[in-house]
Amino acid sequence: MSKAWADNRLTIACKYGFTLIYDEFTRSKPEANNTLLSILQERVLDLPAARNGEDANCYLKVHPKFTAIFTSNPEEYAGTQKAQDALRDRMVTMDLDYFDRTTEIGIIESKSGLEKSEAKKIVDLVRALRKSGQCEFLPTIRAGLMIAKALKINGAKVSADDLIFREIAQDILASATSRLGSKDYYQKSRKLVAELIENYC
């Protein structure tokens, strides 16, 4: 049996000048990202010993066209780690806002298979909850997608008169806007969603 070294995506991107997309990088422990420091600062990748039969560590000069895109959720999200200051100092950070209404409608319509008129109501409901100023955490488009997909599976309609829709929307949005697990907050959130359903659906 013989060993065969296979370069990972990071090595390939550094070698050939590709763009590395590192999705939700703050889910990794900070020490797991240490190798990125020399790549971004000194433009050198430290390769492991015994790579391709070599006995000592060697280095790869990072291609001048190499770029990296890192995505992350805010640090207060469950499961995220605080990013190293040293790593943040080596990147440009852009805070992204929510999509505009038209884009959210298009995403929910295309990913759920619901009619555009129903996607509009879901988007307006989620956006109204965001703007209410009463959420511990603001609901994202994911909450709207979950509602839309659950409705499609259950054959329910986006209507204040549809009990299945009301339950689905209240359950998902109350859960999406709270991270503390407080029963009082959950009930308060369900009540707020019920009121918004009357206004927007």
Indicate residue ranges for each PLM-predicted region.
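C-terminal regulatory/interaction module of P-loop NTP-utilizing enzymes
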Residues: 1-201
